């Protein structure tokens, strides 16, 4: 995909075996698409940038800005180290004034009875967006709110920044995000997070939750 660059974010806190499994799944999904890896420890794949800042929501978006400025393609896609992707996820392209978010996302806890669940919300880990729009939005955000923890691009919740169009898209296959104790989310750190009401033990493409979660080790 010559019009897209993947920006892969990790602070290298996921289990080693998982990191290797995740890498194999991601590379199979993106093929020859260029990738920028942003990590706390050196990595030998993609164009690797090192970050030294403490993990935070604010820092996630600062690293995205670094990657977006380094990329040269019209679009960027975010990939996170606790989310499994498939090839169809990366085929969507929103208009140049719009943020795209994959809405077909299933969650899976790394504790308790392995169960897939669905929640209807956007996520940074599911974003595909025009590169220039990302740069413009984040430069405006950090100029006005340099230290504020602000969430997904396009929504700019709790700010007076200009909102931008967002659009959801639904590939036939769902992506999988894992909840774990090294997350920035306190409910995941304390294992108190609640599942969505739509739940399943098995879903197409990924198979049974009890088997998939075994890769988190």
Positions of PLM-derived features:
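Conserved catalytic core of nucleotide-sugar-dependent glycosyltransferases
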Residues: 90-216
